[in-house]
Amino acid sequence: MDYNQEVVAAQISAMRFTDSDIAPDYQAISTVTHNGRHFSTWDRRFQILCDKLAKNPRYQQIIIPRGLWTLVAILDKDESKLYVMMTDQNLSARRHEVELKGFSTHYVYSLLFVNEGLEPVSEQLEMIPPLDDDKQEHRIKDLEKMLGDWVDQVSEVLIGSFEYGHGEIIGGSLNLFDDNYRLVDSVDLSEQILHPIEQGDVQSNPDIKPQPQEPIVKLRAKRRSQEDKEKKSNSDEK
């Protein structure tokens, strides 16, 4: 799958930031409640994403308000590809919603209308009946509202999804879905998460692809091994 390495590297940098990173700020405000902490984490992620790409005129930041929630999508104007990032947990929930209901008001589902006509690798979801006219119209209007003047500049939507464990990022993938969340293509981002490419390297050639090295399974095995060693060390100290 062709994709922009610079945008993906920026997504990974942004998604490394977690709730635990912002915890000290909230602890200074209150030791009782931390209302808004999750939203603040996402605000920081979007700021990191935008800061990483701000100097390159190739990219357009598209700010999308969704009620209490506001997200930032990145348009690669040279390739007409829109990049969105989310957690793997949320992506799974959104796909399941469409599988059950055949429709969703979630922003990703509306954006994926752009990918209508792409051929999925297999039938991951059961055959979904066509939307009725009202739902189809809602989806199209929602898409146009989100992308505004850029709607005709987007030919493909790519979803970066990221997995977390013990408060830190442990894996991820870049996914191309059809308009019903059926997988067309996917790239494992685990290697880039484990061994980040220097930003200067990807800026010189944003379309480079990383060479696969150690799989995420080995990373998890290493983590477990390290945790076992630490537990044994602590036990010996006691």
Language model features by range: what are they?
Residues 1-40:
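Interdomain/boundary linker segments immediately adjacent to catalytic/signaling cores
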Residues 73-76, 113, 174:
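Short beta-strand element of the conserved SAM-dependent methyltransferase core
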Residues 53-83:
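A short acidic/basic microdomain associated with nuclease active sites
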Residues 96-161:
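Catalytic cores of nucleic-acid endonucleases
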Residues 141-238:
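Glycine-rich, aromatic-bearing surface loops/beta-hairpins
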Residues 77-78, 88-89, 175:
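Secondary-structure transition/turn motif
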Residues 85-87, 92-100:
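Basic, glycine-/proline-tolerant helical and adjacent loop/strand elements
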Residues 29-64:
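Short N-terminal edge-element motif at the start of the domain
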